Amino acid sequence: GKPADEALLCRAADALAAHEELPLQAAELVAAAYCFGEAGCTLAVVELPDAGLAAVLPKMPVCAVTAVGPDGVSRSVERLAALAGGVMRKESICVTAPEQPKAVLSELVVAAGKCDCELVVPDPEDITFLEAEQFASRVDYGGYTVPLAFLGRHAAGNAAMAVELALALCRKGFDIPDEAILDGLAAVENRSSIRVISQRPLVILDA
């Protein structure tokens, strides 16, 4: 949440200048990774606008492909899944969303096989809705019971992915206790564009 240190950015620029020229987005990603490393970060969570940018992050222990659906630009879900599969790396673990369309899952399985990446798919049968209120819910996934700031199966699927990503990191040698997983999920806030203006009567603003 803080701006990167200018001195770190300068050193990152010098390090980049010593290597082959990269496209702008790739160079920015490498510079950010350098700054995270210099700041002493063990792990960084990076959301890629283009899965192809993963090529400049060859040492990702885990990665994720969230739910894939129509994008409104006439590209098929198969094509979108194939593009998303570009995030996978050799000997990494990729976690994807439960209940992906069959066509999407097929593309991801092929992509994982091609680059020797393990694909983990949370079992939707392991997701149990314990209770739901007007604006929140409580679910259990594989023994991890957490309150969610969102309603619906989509949010529960994302929570299952988060659990599987944490467990994948544990398999890669990172020590993440169950309590930390539960605390992390419980701390998630709903910062979407949807705002509840009034509860009685219920008025919701969707920006």
Annotated model-derived regions:
Residues E131-Y144:
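Acidic-glycine-rich active-site phosphate/pyrophosphate-binding loop
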Residues E28, T42-A44, P61-C63, S92-V95, ...:
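Structural motif
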Residues G52-D116:
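Conserved catalytic-core segment of NTP-binding enzymes
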Residues T96-Q100, A111-E133, A149-R153, D175-A187, ...:
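Beta-strand->loop->alpha-helix junctions that form or flank phosphate-binding loops
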Residues G1-P61, P70, S74:
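ATP-dependent carboxylate-amine ligase catalytic core
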Residues H19-V30, C41, V87, S92-V104, ...:
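Phosphate/pyrophosphate-binding catalytic cores of soluble transferases and nucleic-acid-acting enzymes
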Residues L43-A44, L48, G52-A64, V68-G72, ...:
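Nucleotide phosphate-binding/pyrophosphate-handling subdomain across enzymes
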